[in-house]
Amino acid sequence: MAAARHSTLDFMLGAKADGETILKGLQSIFQEQGMAESVHTWQDHGYLATYTNKNGSFANLRIYPHGLVLLDLQSYDGDAQGKEEIDSILNKVEERMKELSQDSTGRVKRLPPIVRGGAIDRYWPTADGRLVEYDIDEVVYDEDSPYQNIKILHSKQFGNILILSGDVNLAESDLAYTRAIMGSGKEDYTGKDVLILGGGDGGILCEIVKLKPKMVTMVEIDQMVIDGCKKYMRKTCGDVLDNLKGDCYQVLIEDCIPVLKRYAKEGREFDYVINDLTAVPISTSPEEDSTWEFLRLILDLSMKVLKQDGKYFTQGNCVNLTEALSLYEEQLGRLYCPVEFSKEIVCVPSYLELWVFYTVWKKAKP
């Protein structure tokens, strides 16, 4: 599958740019490649030169008067000869700019090329909006369920990564996530009743079952997540997803809201409730309102099925999203019962950003 390879080269000159001199100095590099030239000029805004090749590759050279010079080149990623030509152009432009600027170049920045439209999507944003290129080399699983798109991609560093509707959820390398959302090794699960909301990758269930609980109930709405993970995420889930019932656990393929309401009505209580459903929304925009309402409902229902001395564990979001985390903490003060909370910041390998986890418990009755 042919893809577009987008390369960039930036110069920040130490003085104002003589656009005409730079343009004339670089023209021969593109002409040597047989590229046709089109130049636009603005009296106070510099130059834009566009160079096109017969093979479809092209380059944009933008020269700003204040000293910023930008070069963008695009070619077919599958064209080995075209790649060599682009690399040659970049090298020659960098050398020529050093000559033209007479060593007044304050900064040169050459980023790795971005490959767009490839068979394997290697680019995923962090929660706070930064672009990350993963070392993805294989699409292991890609299916649409009635609820979401499910991808499992293989990373050379992180192993298989579960991605749900564009959000990086968990990689085989991410035991740190599972440990954090279970209390970071500080809890004794022996003989305890545990409720997991979500958790379709099986990581939490797999780790808790090892700790000899009385019973673990996991409520996951999406059977296809379980099916994909039990086949391709076995380093995370082991064999616990092979059967929906075991000696000390059961997996319910249901929406957790009706289940929580049913348990609350029955008066059923748990020592631990672990919410692995979704991260804290990043804003209070109208598009996010339904997610905030969902989180508030989950919190209230979870407190109703949590024992007085029990604990509720959940993820927050990226540590940089301070406003979103503060809004979540405000919600904790609006529950039907008074609660206290603590938080922990953990490095989850595949997230490539620090992540916040919460522990919530009911205030002691006077």
Curated annotation (Swiss-Prot):
Catalytic activity: S-adenosyl 3-(methylsulfanyl)propylamine + spermidine = spermine + S-methyl-5'-thioadenosine + H(+)
SUPFAM superfamilies linked to this entry: S-adenosyl-L-methionine-dependent methyltransferases
Residues involved in S-adenosyl 3-(methylsulfanyl)propylamine binding: 148, 220, 255-256
Stored CDD domains: AdoMet_MTases
Active-site residue numbers: 276
GO MF term set: spermine synthase activity
Its EC number(s): 2.5.1.22
Residues in PABS domain copies: 122-362
One Pfam family per UniProt: Spermine_synth
Reported impact of residue 201 to A/N: 100,000-fold decrease in catalytic efficiency
Residue numbers of Phosphoserine PTMs: 57
Positions that bind spermidine: 177, 201, 351, 353
Pathway: Amine and polyamine biosynthesis; spermine biosynthesis; spermine from spermidine: step 1/1
UniProt keyword annotations, A-Z: Acetylation, Intellectual disability, Phosphoprotein, Polyamine biosynthesis, Transferase
Record carries keyword Transferase: yes
An example Gene Ontology biological process: methionine metabolic process
Family: Belongs to the spermidine/spermine synthase family.
PANTHER family hit by this protein: SPERMINE SYNTHASE
Oligomeric form and interacting partners: Homodimer. Dimerization is mediated through the N-terminal domain and seems to be required for activity as deletion of the N-terminal domain causes complete loss of activity.
Function, in words: Catalyzes the production of spermine from spermidine and decarboxylated S-adenosylmethionine (dcSAM).
Notes concerning its domains: Composed of 3 domains: the N-terminal domain has structural similarity to S-adenosylmethionine decarboxylase, the central domain is made up of four beta strands and the C-terminal domain is similar in structure to spermidine synthase. The N- and C-terminal domains are both required for activity.
Pathological condition linked to this protein in its record: Intellectual developmental disorder, X-linked, syndromic, Snyder-Robinson type: An X-linked intellectual disability syndrome characterized by a collection of clinical features including facial asymmetry, marfanoid habitus, hypertonia, osteoporosis and unsteady gait.
Annotated protein name in UniProt: Spermine synthase
Lineage: Eukaryota, Metazoa, Chordata, Craniata, Vertebrata
